[in-house]
């Protein structure tokens, strides 16, 4: 009985310690990566500069604690909170 109780305690501690980690697509490779603790928002930014008409927007993907603030040089900004949603 003590062995069963000890096993249950160890399993509970291990499960609680693992926690949940968010994964987001990260530029430039657009591969899923685990976000740092506390960064539970995925984002995708399309940035434009003077070369935008020639080469198109620069795409940035990553993790953030909150959705980045929209700026004037952004063509678009997507924020989401499910795994790998920033594609």
UniProtKB/Swiss-Prot annotation:
S-S pairs: 24-42, 35-63, 48-52, 67-79, 80-85
Assembly and interaction partners: Homo- and heterodimer; non-covalently linked.
GO molecular function, one term: acetylcholine receptor inhibitor activity
GO cellular component, one term: extracellular region
InterPro entries: Snake_3FTx, Snake_toxin-like_sf, Snake_toxin_con_site, Toxin_cobra-type
Keywords: Acetylcholine receptor inhibiting toxin, Disulfide bond, Ion channel impairing toxin, Neurotoxin, Postsynaptic neurotoxin, Secreted, Signal, Toxin
Recorded family membership: Belongs to the three-finger toxin family. Long-chain subfamily. Kappa-neurotoxin sub-subfamily.
Top-rank taxon, per record: Eukaryota
Functional note: Postsynaptic neurotoxin that binds and inhibits neuronal nicotinic acetylcholine receptors (nAChR) with high affinity (IC(50)<100 nM). Is a selective, and slowly reversible antagonist of alpha-3/CHRNA3-containing and some alpha-4/CHRNA4-containing AChRs.
Keyword Secreted: yes
Residues making up the signal peptide according to the UniProt record: 1-21
Subcellular location per the Swiss-Prot or TrEMBL entry: Secreted
Tissue expression remark: Expressed by the venom gland.
Protein name in UniProt: Kappa-5-bungarotoxin
């Amino acid at each position: 009985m003590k062995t069963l109780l000890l096993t249950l305690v160890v399993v509970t501690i291990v499960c609680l310690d693992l926690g949940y980690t968010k994964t987001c697509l990260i530029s430039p490779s657009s591969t899923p990566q685990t976000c740092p603790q506390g960064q539970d928002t995925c984002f995708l930014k399309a940035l434009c500069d003077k070369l935008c008409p020639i080469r198109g927007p620069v795409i940035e993907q990553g993790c953030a604690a909150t959705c980045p603030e929209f700026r004037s040089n952004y063509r678009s900004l997507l924020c989401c909170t499910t795994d790998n949603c920033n594609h």
